[in-house]
């Protein structure tokens, strides 16, 4: 009986920890993360204070923070080839990182770090030098900056069969030296690295290449981490938020269900299907059952996005900034729908798979510059600064904890729905106008469409909609309008 009680206690404790790791630790009613891909720490700190906090964003996913290999031309993916756990990259050093985390936390913006636990750098001719000046010999699996030696890695092998669990989890992903997370020593170094970031005030981690590590090894690592730092405004006993990169199209040998109890899981099918719909390959009317009805993970387990830094560079259904009208519609739907834990992308312009972030002649990352409307102009795309996107972050905050209701569609590519009695969204992806009286579910009054403009000094700078005492309003979205979406909410009432 004593053994049974102890086993039950340990089981419940483990379940409690894993449940806590699904909590993003947002501040107030904020509930949207933005990925400021390849931004410098000093620029993120300023963005938190001057843009993200005033517009209601909840958190920032940052690029990998630890020292990486220096690759010719400085492609973005060099950040995913670590050679030590020193906090020095092209985004800045440890002091600048710590300052950024503190300043962002001070204004209610949480920081989530993209962490590389699966591997170290791939092969390099001779001695490699990292962004902190550390030397390593990746071909010999020698990383003195940690230190790691060959005994800390799985034996070298290539992934040739993606249906072979051993290859997926113990061979080298695109040639990257595969760490043995079952080793007590490797586990200790990874835990030490993550705990240091927790001490500096981060709220959680995106775990890169999680499916290439055994779930039981990750469970041990996550369970060994410190609680979040209360000096940065986190409650006592708060656990780091974990979201794990697991690419699972529904027929994978290593499945998302192995990881979704440990933390949230990236729902890549969400990205593909929302792209299909707004590219016109699937009628929007089918989005009425969006979420688990499409075979996605449960909402609290699903980390969702229209695109990410990887798949935005692929050919296929995934939308990116290069299709701006469809991208804004898809993002508006994403932010208006209650499904999933949401991240929006903030990119830099690219022409190919290897394009580096905007940099100067000395290969230093440059700071974003802005025009009079606040949009980025010097190689940074900054989708999060597009009015149609940041306004929907405000919409999402306004409708938090309400249900989707009042669905309407025209049997094709015109849809609308309510979020309780606090918000309304309409989308027109047809080649003809949407002009109709629709139920907005809102209290009577005049509302600004936050897509086409803003509420400033009691007046709308864009479209407005008058809602009658029955909640109905006349909705018009022309087929040739600049934006194919209209959004109203109670905080934009005139």
UniProtKB/Swiss-Prot annotation:
EC nos: 3.2.1.1
GO MF entries: alpha-amylase activity; metal ion binding
SUPFAM superfamilies: (Trans)glycosidases, Glycosyl hydrolase domain
Co-factor remark: Binds 1 Ca(2+) ion per subunit.
Keyword presence, DNA-binding: no
Residues holding chloride: 206, 308, 343
Statement: the UniProt record of this protein carries the keyword Repressor: no
Active site: 208, 245
Site (Transition state stabilizer): 310
Pyrrolidone carboxylic acid modification, residue list: 21
Protein name (database record): Alpha-amylase-related protein
Compartments in which it is found: Secreted
Family: Belongs to the glycosyl hydrolase 13 family.
Lineage, highest ranks first: Eukaryota, Metazoa, Ecdysozoa, Arthropoda, Hexapoda
Catalytic activity: Endohydrolysis of (1->4)-alpha-D-glucosidic linkages in polysaccharides containing three or more (1->4)-alpha-linked D-glucose units
Residues forming coiled coils: none
Residues the record lists as binding Ca(2+): 118, 169, 178, 212
Signal peptide positions (record): 1-20
CDD domains given in the database record: AmyAc_bac_euk_AmyA
